[in-house]
Structure formats: C-alpha cells, structure tokens
C-alpha cells in the first residue's frame, strides 16, 4: 500500500514536470523497490498503478500529447499506458530475481547487480513499449508531431522523445539502485 501511494504521488507530481515536450517518469524507483522486495508479480501490479496514473493524466489533459491520443482512441491509449507500466514492473522483478537470487547466495553484490540491471531494464521497457505503441498504433499522430518539429519520425523519436527523458529516468534509477539495495538488505535482515 505504501509503494502504491508513493507511485501515485510521484507520478501525479511528474505529470506537471516537463523536460522538453514530455513528462518524466519518477515512479519507476518505487516500482523497482517493490519488485525487489516482493517479486515480479508485485512489480507488475505496481507498474499497473503507475500506468493507471499515466492514463489518468491523459484523460484529464495533464499530458497534452496523451490527451490527443486518448481522444483519438481511448482503448489503444489505455493499452499503451497500462501495458508499458505493467511490463516494466514485471521485467524489473524478473531481472532482479534472476541476478540477485540467481546463485545459491543472496549477497549484497548480487543485490546491487540485480538492482542496477533492473534499474536499466525498467526504463528501457517503459520507453521502448511507449515508442512501439506510438509507432504501430498511432502512426499518423507520430508523423504529424515529427513533421511539426521539422524532423523525420525516427529522428523525432530518438532525439526529441527519448533523449532527455530516457537519460534522466535511467540516471535516476541507477542512482537509486544503491538505495534499493539498502532497503532490500534491511528488510531481509529484519
């Protein structure tokens, strides 16, 4: 319940913080902590909460691009928002479990490796599925945004949509990996 509340608060706040034309995802860190503490299913559930808040931002117009997609096709917008969140949380949990618990021992080094790997995989899955969703489900909107920016679709996706947000999300997750290890370590010792 605590992780759910943290995710809701962080993502609502993030809905109003923009780096370039898009909002940054701040909720991946608590998803990673939940996935590390409670496993891949918990990561998927927490990712679903994150996706629901992102969808709410689209519906309420907090995310202007998301609002355009919602008005164009609510079902596909919900599919992208919820799907990318759920799968990012699931992937983080699976990667953490495979690395941190992959051997017979659950050492702090394995936990750190698992946290770092999960911290990389989660934003890659989140951003990757978002881009694939736009490319395959909303190509006319993606083309219009790219044309409006004077870019090709691929250039727009890489340099406008991914560059700033993805790098910031990745750095935040990597920095917080050490915090995640401490939380998991403290819990396993109690």
What are these regions (language model features)?
Residues 1-190:
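Loop-helix junctions at membrane interfaces
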């Amino acid at each position: 319940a605590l992780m759910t509340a943290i995710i809701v608060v962080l993502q609502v706040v993030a809905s109003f913080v923009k780096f370039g034309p898009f909002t940054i995802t701040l909720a991946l860190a608590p998803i990673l902590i939940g996935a590390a503490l409670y496993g891949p299913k918990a990561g998927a559930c927490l990712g679903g909460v994150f996706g629901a808040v992102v969808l709410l931002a689209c519906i309420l117009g907090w995310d202007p691009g998301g609002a355009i997609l919602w008005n164009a096709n609510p079902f596909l917008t919900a599919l992208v928002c919820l799907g990318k969140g759920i799968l990012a949380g699931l992937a983080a949990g699976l990667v953490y479990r495979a690395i941190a618990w992959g051997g017979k021992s659950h050492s702090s080094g394995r936990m750190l490796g698992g946290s770092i790997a999960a911290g990389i995989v989660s934003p890659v899955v989140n951003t990757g599925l978002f881009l694939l969703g736009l490319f395959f489900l909303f190509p006319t909107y993606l083309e219009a945004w790219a044309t409006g920016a004077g870019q090709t679709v691929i250039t727009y996706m890489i340099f406008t949509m991914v560059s700033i947000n993805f790098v910031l999300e990745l750095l935040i997750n990597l920095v917080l990996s050490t915090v995640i290890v401490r939380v998991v370590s403290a819990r396993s010792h109690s």
